[in-house]
């Protein structure tokens, strides 16, 4: 996308040597998204073009210079690069599943207490952070439609929280490459927030401890503190009380995630939840059994399944069909969080009916595995992790002007 050409008056008819700079912008080489540029143009700097001004000495000639408005952002980013020790950072933002989820009581504040084994898995988003010269606003872009890009997004909330807690004044260009579906019970937004807090702390020279980041994060979301564990945790309270544990599950156990196009409203699921009809099994006994005997159908209890199946009856049918069609290939089939993702642990392959039935032509499918992270490092995407099939891509972003 080029602006109208700029004309200069030239009175010297001699050969004139002009610098022609053609800028192509993409997320791989500059900190802000610009998917609307022609991707066939190559990135060339300082290439020269010779222009002749013909005619009489006294005639005035016009010389055409190609100009791209993105040049000003290139210069700003280069200036930031020179002045800052860390100016760009790309991080993996993995999601989680609830291997079991017990709702243990209703609190006076209207929330419910839970007890759950949270575990990070290999499906995740990528978030690219770049320092912005702005001192007043973050700029967020993403590759999918329907994701809010303003203060409703947990990424922006996390940056505002970090600045409030630390007094730092860094603002960012952020691009979210989204692969985790929304409304899935996988904690994708919570992971984005935790990843953002960790990134902001890196840019500020780690002025906060991870423990502080974890405590602060509970102010903007109950599931966010979990991601500051090492990847496996027994979580209680609203989910913000995190007990880091060694992973009780071998990392080589595969799984498949199946999410229908319809999402479950978490608020509606909890509204329909009836405590007196929920499971009475001791959650610590579930954790102990998983640690000693591994995952099985009887330990993957989710008290939110009955109300979620009321909200979305087709989800119950999907779970039943996966169990029946699996014929023992899955160690357990269960819903994660408040839905609407059905998880089949034990095989990376979905049952054939998901491909054959018209009803499931729009489902999200992904294989995944359990992962953790080393101390003082963030999560790293495994090379083998993949999403089954092509997912539709869109592009939206803030105006960079």
UniProtKB/Swiss-Prot annotation:
CC cofactor: Mg(2+)
Cofactor note: Divalent metal ions. Preferably magnesium.
Location relative to the cell: Plastid, Chloroplast; Plastid, Chromoplast
UniProt keywords, alphabetically: ATP-binding, Chloroplast, Chromoplast, Isoprene biosynthesis, Kinase, Nucleotide-binding, Plastid, Transferase, Transit peptide
Protein origin, superkingdom: Eukaryota
Residues the entry annotates as binding ATP: 181-191
Function description: Catalyzes the phosphorylation of the position 2 hydroxy group of 4-diphosphocytidyl-2C-methyl-D-erythritol.
Full protein name: 4-diphosphocytidyl-2-C-methyl-D-erythritol kinase, chloroplastic/chromoplastic
Gene that specifies this protein: ISPE
